[in-house]
Curated annotation (Swiss-Prot):
Principal subcellular localization: cytoplasm
One Pfam family linked to the record: SlmA-like_C
Residues annotated to bind DNA: 51-70
Name of encoding gene: slmA
Comp. bias regions, Basic and acidic residues: 13-23
Span list, region Disordered: 1-23
Keywords attached to this entry: Cell cycle, Cell division, Cytoplasm, DNA-binding
InterPro entries for this protein: DNA-bd_HTH_TetR-type_CS, Homeodomain-like_sf, HTH-type_Tx_Regulator, HTH_TetR, NO_SlmA, SlmA-like_C
GO molecular function, one term: sequence-specific DNA binding
Complexes and interactors: Homodimer. Interacts with FtsZ.
Species classification: Bacteria, Pseudomonadati, Pseudomonadota, Gammaproteobacteria, Pasteurellales
Record's protein name: Nucleoid occlusion factor SlmA
The species this protein was found in: Mannheimia succiniciproducens (strain KCTC 0769BP / MBEL55E)
Length: 216
């Protein structure tokens, strides 16, 4: 299982310290590789094919050394996807604990997801598949599993409404959950399409007005 990155560890620009990297543990080296990869995906060349030569140069090690930390580039991207899942779903779990009202839960979770996308453009490119266009097809399937899991999370939250609040929805909970995930995917795609000039949390409250009637 890949080591987990926190959002804070993704944000700062990594420093190139090739002279010191050999003193770091394997876990720290893997962390650095993933952090540098994330920032390269964030950069202006983030849509270009990511090569191990380019990544090794930015990390400050040889390609051979890079493969000591990860057996393949595919494994690096798989680790990034696992870290996205860990970061988002841990925050979803926290939101569920802090908020008991279903309407507020869904609102807060959507807002949190869009905030994540805003802060992590490189990872958003992974979620839309743009960063994976030149990689193995199984990575696209792995991202699809992430969205399936997100949809199931929404289904569970919506189904709990009847037990917690004694209320139901005018349409099936799974249909609503599918719409919520599609809404997220659409915002991610627009963010990438506009090269992150349009932030998904801008105008969110106005867009929320189309979702809110489902909870009445």
């Amino acid at each position: 299982m890949a080591e987990q990155l926190t959002l804070d560890s993704i944000e700062p620009e990594p420093e190139k310290q090739s002279a010191k990297i050999e003193k770091r543990s394997i876990k720290e080296r893997r962390q650095q590789v993933l952090t540098v990869l994330t920032h390269l995906l964030h950069s202006e060349k983030g849509m270009e094919r990511m090569t191990t030569a380019r990544l090794a140069k930015e990390v400050g090690v040889s390609e051979a050394a890079l493969y000591r930390y990860f057996p393949s580039k595919t494994k690096m991207f798989e680790a990034l996807i696992e870290n996205i899942e860990s970061s988002l779903f841990s925050r979803i779990s926290y939101s569920i604990k802090m908020e008991t009202n279903t309407l507020n839960r869904v609102h807060d979770i959507l807002q949190m997801i869009f905030d994540f996308a805003r802060k992590n453009p490189g990872l958003t490119r992974v979620l839309t598949g743009h960063a994976l266009m030149f990689e193995e097809a199984k990575l696209q399937a792995r991202v699809a599993l992430f969205f399936d899991r997100l949809e199931l999370q929404f289904v569970n939250i919506l189904q709990m409404r009847k037990l917690r609040e004694g209320k139901t929805f005018p349409i099936d909970e799974r249909t609503i959950a599918t719409y919520l995930v599609t809404f997220c995917e659409g915002q991610f795609m627009r963010l990438v399409r506009t090269n992150f000039r349009h932030m998904p949390n801008q105008g969110f409250e106005q867009q929320w007005r189309f979702i809110e009637p489902l909870f009445e």
